[in-house]
C-alpha cells in the first residue's frame, strides 16, 4: 500500500523530477564543459553504468581527463589515470571470476579513505559485481559471519587489518588494498594495476549491476548487510546538491568515512560534478586544516566528531580556511553548541544532512536554516516520501512528535539476511527516530525511538540533557542515556569527560545535577553521573553505548 494515490504519485514524481533537474543544472551535474564528445556520451554512460562511481569517473575522464580526481596519502590521480586504473582492476577481477569459475563477483572492501576503497568501488561498476563495504572496526568474529552469510569471494583489505582475519578464510581471493609492508608475491591493488591489461577479459558493454551493500553499524553480532540499488536518475541527489553551493570543478575535502553511506554518497557526488576528492586515511585535525589551506578546498564533507576535533585544536583560528564555501555534515547529530562554534569559526556555511544507511537522505537543511534553527534537519528532498506516525500507525499532524517513516528510490531493497525484519507502514520504512515538523515544514529529530524514556510519568529525551551539559564549563564531552530503575523503571544517566584544566577538576556529580536542574525540568536531572576518560565511538563518530562502563547510582 502506498501513502500516495495514483494521481498524487504522478504529481509527486513530476515535481521531484523538476526539483532534481533544477538542482542538477545549477551544479552542472550533467555538463560537458565544452566537450562535444562528452556531451554525446552522457546518456550512454548513464545507460551502461547508472549513477555509479564507475559512471561518474568514466564521464569525467572523457570531459576533463587531466583534472585531478583524487588527492590522497599516495599522491594525485587525474580522472584519466583513475578511470584507467579502475578498468584495469575490473578486468583483473573478471579474470579471477573466469579462473575460479565464479557465477558472480561478490567483492568485500575493508579499507580506509583513499584509492584503496575508491578504485574497487569504481571497478565494481565496470565489471558488474556485488560490492560489500565493510566497517573498518569489524572484529574477526564479525568478519567471519559477514563472509559466510554473504558468500564473499573476493576481498580488498588494508594490511593494517590483517590481524582481523578469521581463522578460516575459505576460498576468498584476498587483495591488499593499502600496504605498509612488503607482501612478497601476494596480490596487491598496486600489482593489479601495474600488471597491465593486455591479455585480460574485455569489460562488458552493459555490466550486470549488483547491489551496493553497506553494513549496519552494530557493535555486537553480525552487522546487517543493507542492499542498496544504484538507479540511473536518483532524484534524491537533488537534495544533496540544493543544500550547499555545489558546482563543477571544486576541491572537496572528504573526511567522512567512505565505507559509510554518507562518505560513499559524497564521493559519488564529487566525481559526478567533475570535482576533486581530497582525503586522508587517518583523520588528524591539523592535517585537515592543512589540506583545506594548501588545496584551497571550497567544500568539506564531514561528520560532527571530525570538525569538533578541528575546533578543539589550540590556535585553530590561525589556519586559513577562507576558501571554504560549505561544510556538509552528516553521520551523527549536531548539537546547538557545536553549530554555534562551527559558525563562529568558519562562518554561516554549515549544512545538515539527515538519513540512514537503509534509507539514504531523509532531509537536508541549508546553511541559512541551520543558522536560524540550530538542530533542524530541514526539508524533505525531492523523490522522498516522509511521514510521521504514532504508535497506533496513525499519521500525526505538524507540530506533534511521531515515528519517522520514509522511502525513496535509493532506499534499501532488503537485507542480505532475508529473515531481518523491515518495519513498514503504507509502504514507508521506519528509520528508527522520533521527530516533528515545525511551522515552516522543517523536520526536527529528537532521538531514537528506543532512546526516549519515561521518568515519573514524563517523557525525557536524553539528547536534551546532553545538549545542556555540553555548555557546562569544565565538560569536554558527554553522553546521556536511560538505565533501568527498580522504582521509576528508567532513570537518566550521564557519562562525562571533564576538561583537563582547573575548571574540569571542579566539576562534581552534584555540580552536574545542579546545572541540569537550572536548565531543564526535574525529571531530566541525572541520578547517575559517571566520570570517564573518554567516550567509546565507532568509525563515524557515534558513541557506542554498549562499550560504556556500567552506570553507578549515588543514593
Regions found by a protein language model. Name each.
Residues 49, 75, 90-138, 459, ...:
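Conserved AMP-binding/adenylate-forming
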Residues 65, 193-215, 222, 245-251:
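Conserved pre-ATP/AMP-binding loop-to-beta segment of ANL
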Residues 78-80, 211-235:
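Conserved AMP-binding A3 loop
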Residues 83-88, 226-247, 308:
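Conserved structural elements of the adenylate-forming
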Residues 91, 117, 292, 300, ...:
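AMP-binding/adenylate-forming catalytic core of the ANL superfamily
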Residues 234-251, 259-299, 313:
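Conserved AMP-binding/adenylation subdomain of ANL enzymes
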Residues 298-299, 315-373, 385:
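Gly/Ser/Thr-rich phosphate-binding loop
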Residues 379-383, 394-425, 442, 458-460:
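Conserved ATP/PPi-binding loop(s) of AMP-dependent carboxylate-activating enzymes
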Amino acid at each position: 500500500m502506498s501513502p500516495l494515490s495514483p494521481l498524487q504519485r504522478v504529481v509527486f514524481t513530476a515535481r521531484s523530477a523538476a526539483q532534481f533537474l533544477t538542482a542538477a543544472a545549477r551544479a552542472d551535474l550533467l555538463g560537458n564543459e565544452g566537450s562535444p564528445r562528452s556531451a554525446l556520451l552522457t546518456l550512454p554512460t548513464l545507460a551502461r553504468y547508472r549513477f555509479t562511481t564507475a559512471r561518474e569517473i568514466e564521464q569525467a575522464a572523457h570531459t576533463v581527463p587531466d583534472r585531478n580526481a583524487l588527492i590522497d596519502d599516495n599522491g594525485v590521480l587525474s580522472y584519466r589515470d583513475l578511470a584507467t586504473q579502475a578498468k584495469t582492476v575490473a578486468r583483473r577481477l573478471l579474470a579471477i571470476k573466469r579462473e575460479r569459475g565464479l557465477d558472480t563477483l561478490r567483492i568485500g572492501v575493508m579499507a580506509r579513505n583513499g584509492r584503496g576503497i575508491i578504485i574497487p568501488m569504481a571497478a565494481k561498476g565496470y565489471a558488474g559485481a556485488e560490492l560489500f563495504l565493510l566497517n573498518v572496526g569489524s572484529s574477526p568474529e564479525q568478519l567471519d559471519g559477514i563472509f559466510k552469510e554473504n558468500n564473499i569471494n573476493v576481498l580488498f583489505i588494508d594490511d593494517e587489518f590483517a590481524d582481523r582475519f578469521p581463522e578460516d578464510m575459505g576460498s576468498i581471493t584476498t587483495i591488499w588494498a593499502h600496504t605498509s609492508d612488503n607482501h612478497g608475491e601476494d596480490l596487491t591493488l598496486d600489482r593489479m594495476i601495474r600488471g597491465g591489461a593486455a591479455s585480460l577479459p574485455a569489460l562488458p558493454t552493459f555490466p550486470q549491476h549488483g547491489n551496493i551493500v553497506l553494513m549496519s553499524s552494530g557493535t555486537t553480532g553480525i552487522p546487517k548487510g543493507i542492499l542498496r540499488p544504484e538507479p540511473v536518475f536518483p532524484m534524491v541527489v537533488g537534495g544533496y546538491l540544493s543544500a550547499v553551493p555545489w558546482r563543477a570543478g571544486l576541491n572537496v575535502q572528504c573526511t567522512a568515512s567512505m565505507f559509510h553511506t554518507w562518505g560513499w554518497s559524497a564521493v559519488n557526488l564529487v566525481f559526478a560534478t567533475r570535482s576533486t576528492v581530497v582525503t586522508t586515511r587517518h583523520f588528524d585535525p591539523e592535517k585537515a586544516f592543512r589540506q583545506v589551506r594548501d588545496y584551497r578546498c571550497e567544500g568539506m564533507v564531514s561528520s560532527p566528531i571530525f570538525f569538533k576535533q578541528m575546533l578543539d585544536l589550540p590556535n585553530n583560528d590561525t589556519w586559513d580556511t577562507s576558501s571554504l564555501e560549505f561544510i556538509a555534515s552528516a553521520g551523527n547529530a549536531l548539537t546547538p553548541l557545536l553549530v554555534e562554534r562551527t559558525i563562529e569559526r568558519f562562518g554561516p556555511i554549515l549544512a545538515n544532512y539527515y538519513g540512514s544507511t537503509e534509507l539514504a537522505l531523509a532531509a537536508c537543511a541549508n546553511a541559512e536554516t541551520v543558522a536560524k534553527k540550530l538542530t533542524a534537519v530541514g526539508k524533505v528532498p525531492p523523490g522522498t516520501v516522509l511521514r510521521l506516525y504514532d504508535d497506533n500507525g496513525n499519521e500525526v499532524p505538524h507540530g506533534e512528535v511521531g515515528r519517522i517513516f520514509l522511502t525513496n528510490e535509493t532506499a534499501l531493497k532488503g537485507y542480505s539476511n532475508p529473515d531481518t525484519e523491515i518495519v513498514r507502514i503504507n509502504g514507508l520504512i521506519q528509520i528508527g527516530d522520533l521527530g516533528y515538523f515545525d511551522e515552516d515544514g522543517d523536520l526536527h529529530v529528537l532521538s531514537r525511538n528506543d532512546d526516549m524514556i519515561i521518568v515519573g510519568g514524563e517523557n525525557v529525551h536524553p539528547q536534551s540533557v546532553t545538549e545542556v551539559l555540553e555548555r557546562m564549563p569544565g565538560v569536554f564531552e558527554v553522553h546521556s542515556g536511560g538505565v533501568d530503575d527498580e522504582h521509576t523503571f528508567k532513570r537518566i544517566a550521564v557519562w562525562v569527560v571533564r576538561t583537563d584544566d582547573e575548571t574540569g577538576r571542579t566539576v562534581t556529580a552534584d555540580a552536574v545535577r545542579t546545572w541540569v536542574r537550572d536548565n531543564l525540568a526535574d525529571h531530566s536531572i541525572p541520578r547517575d553521573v559517571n566520570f570517564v576518560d573518554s567516550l567509546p565511538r565507532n568509525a563515524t563518530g557515534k558513541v557506542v553505548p554498549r562499550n560504556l562502563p556500567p552506570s553507578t547510582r549515588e543514593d
